[in-house]
Amino acid sequence: MLRVHALWRYPVKSLRGEACETVTLEERGVVGDRLYAIRDTDGKFGSGKSTRRFRRIDRLFELSSEYEDDVPVVRFPDGGTMRGDDPNILKALSGFLGQTVTLAREEAIPHFDASPVHIITTSALAWLQDRLPDRQI
């Protein structure tokens, strides 16, 4: 028997996300997942790696995001939060990341790297934990 242990959604690409009790799936994947991304002045989206479309921005992983009334809310490491529709969000993100950025809503091309949905089994997590004993998986 299969059991779902956790459901996660990531409102802003490459930021930590939010645990959800339920999600709605549609053609593009989980509703609201990676619907927003941080974009640099060259038009590349912030990510953990650099590719043709994405640029590595190291401090992204220190931030998390969740939704409040369909608006992404960014949480900073100090616990402070800022809504995506706050006029000061771009200044705060740019200051934190050390470069000028914008918060971009998805347009014609999705913000997904490869796939809109990922299913990770607990056995795969256990396998990874065995190989990385000094890390919390």
Regions found by a protein language model. Name each.
Residues 1-137:
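Electropositive, beta-rich accessory/interaction domains or terminal extensions
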